[in-house]
């Protein structure tokens, strides 16, 4: 089928991060947003720097101060940031100047198809997009799915990740409608917020392998297309 970037997000425990990395996923995500269910305080995240180098370490932020991200990069060795707030294209561009070499993923919360129009504003200021289901109070990890058939055949200007309510049981159905560069799972592979279920992660990878998917080590470069 091709190569697929697989990110497991909302990790809070070192033992689970190491075990999930060993299963062969592409990336691990860590929530740096206070007062959210899967928040990992920086003071408890120094172990991120010891994770295997082959796995992408993605910090998830909402309308962050660039200095906060810089501290996370220094302490935890982040290799990418995922921006889930109202960050403008100019702010994303400035972040790239502030932290060269750190990949930027801009999350778009999709409520209506018209929300996809915003994707084209970010085509030259981030390396990838992430499509997530809209929720009025929460920026992610809601367990709500997108309308996959409705999104089919919509073009995006960058490599992109599909998020929103994905599980080992529905991921192949989602991929039958869409052709993302990657997928992002959180609530669909855990027992409770922040407590990942390693068997569910294993089952996810088995489902993908059964259909011929190979796990990508990195997202495509923006100029490689979708």
From Swiss-Prot:
SUPFAM superfamilies: Ribulose-phoshate binding barrel. InterPro entries: Aldolase_TIM, PRAI_dom, RibuloseP-bd_barrel, TrpF_fam. The keyword Isomerase applies. Keywords: Amino-acid biosynthesis, Aromatic amino acid biosynthesis, Isomerase, Tryptophan biosynthesis. It comes from the Bacteria. GO terms for molecular function: phosphoribosylanthranilate isomerase activity. It catalyses: N-(5-phospho-beta-D-ribosyl)anthranilate = 1-(2-carboxyphenylamino)-1-deoxy-D-ribulose 5-phosphate. The keyword Isomerase applies. Pathway: Amino-acid biosynthesis; L-tryptophan biosynthesis; L-tryptophan from chorismate: step 3/5. Its EC number is 5.3.1.24. It holds the Pfam family PRAI. CDD domains: PRAI (cd00405). Belongs to the TrpF family. HAMAP family: PRAI. This is N-(5'-phosphoribosyl)anthranilate isomerase. It comes from Synechococcus sp. (strain JA-3-3Ab). The gene is trpF.
């Amino acid at each position: 089928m091709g190569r697929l970037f697989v990110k497991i997000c909302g990790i809070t425990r070192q033992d689970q991060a190491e075990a999930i990395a060993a299963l062969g996923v592409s990336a691990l995500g860590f929530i740096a947003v206070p007062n959210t269910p899967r928040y990992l305080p920086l003071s408890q995240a120094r172990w991120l720097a010891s994770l295997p180098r082959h796995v992408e370490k993605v910090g998830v932020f909402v309308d962050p101060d660039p200095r906060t991200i810089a501290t996370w990069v220094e302490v935890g060795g982040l290799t990418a940031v995922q921006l889930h707030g109202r960050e403008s294209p100019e702010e994303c561009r400035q972040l790239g100047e502030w932290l060269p070499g750190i990949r930027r993923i801009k999350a778009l919360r999709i409520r209506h198809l018209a929300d996809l129009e915003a994707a084209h504003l970010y085509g030259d200021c981030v390396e990838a997009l992430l499509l997530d289901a809209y929720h009025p109070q929460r920026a992610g990890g809601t367990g709500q799915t997108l309308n996959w058939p409705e999104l089919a055949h919509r073009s995006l200007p960058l490599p992109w990740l599909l998020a929103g309510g994905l599980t080992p049981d529905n991921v192949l159905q989602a991929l039958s409608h869409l052709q993302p560069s990657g997928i992002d799972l959180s609530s669909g592979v855990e027992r409770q917020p922040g407590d990942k279920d390693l068997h569910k992660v294993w089952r996810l990878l088995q489902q993908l392998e059964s259909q011929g998917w190979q796990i990508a080590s990195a997202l495509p470069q923006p100029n490689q297309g979708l």
